[in-house]
A protein has these predicted regions:
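Extended C-terminal regions of large enzymes
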Residues: 1-189
Length: 189
């Protein structure tokens, strides 16, 4: 199956094969375009764990397979718990960016250290969001509200500039300027 006019045909199930027991054996759909961008590259899964995207180190073939397993697992969590990839990916990336820039700390995140590419940190944050537990109660409100929460908590309005939103909604992975999409005005109004 594929989306209308899309040649990727990414809607099929696959079992995750990983050296990480958290992900190994999970059966899920393969990530679609939005998932690849928003809960894949946006979260640093295609980089060496803990490195920033700017440091860009090449991955080995085995590391690429693990990166894809992380993307598929994070997609599974979003699918399984009816979460939106676009808002979820933007929100989690915001938290990672704020942490990287030392604008928030592990203490602000109930002890979670959200370094780029760490699927265990993403798993822990998503579970807190799903249960609205601890900091997850604030993160569950979306990217803009997460930025507002940390800006107020840290008394730092500069935090708001890191929220990748337009009119309060997270920016998608697809190009919203495409006339084939038919939704370009939806992002502006």
């Amino acid at each position: 199956l594929s989306c209308p006019n899309c040649n990727l045909h990414c809607m099929f199930s696959s079992e995750i094969t990983s050296s990480d027991p958290l992900m190994n054996g999970v059966l899920s759909d393969m990530p679609d375009w939005e998932a690849l961008g928003m809960v894949g590259g946006n979260l640093g899964f295609m980089e060496k764990e803990g490195k920033t995207p700017e440091e860009g180190q090449k991955l080995t073939q085995a590391e690429r397979r693990e990166a894809l397993a992380k993307i598929q697992y994070t997609t599974f969590l979003h699918d399984n718990y009816s979460l939106d990839y676009i808002e979820g990916g933007n929100n989690l990336a915001l938290v990672q960016e704020l942490y990287q820039r030392k604008l928030i700390t592990e203490a602000d995140l109930d002890g979670i250290k959200p370094v780029w590419g760490d699927v265990h940190a993403i798993d822990a944050l998503l579970k807190k969001i799903i249960l609205r537990e601890g900091v997850g109660d604030h993160l569950a409100n979306g990217t803009l509200e997460t930025a507002k929460y940390f800006a107020q908590k840290k008394n730092n309005p500069e935090i708001l500039k890191y929220a990748g939103v337009t009119h309060g909604y997270g920016q998608p992975a697809h190009g919203v300027r495409s006339h084939a999409d038919g939704s370009d005005l939806e992002y502006l109004t």
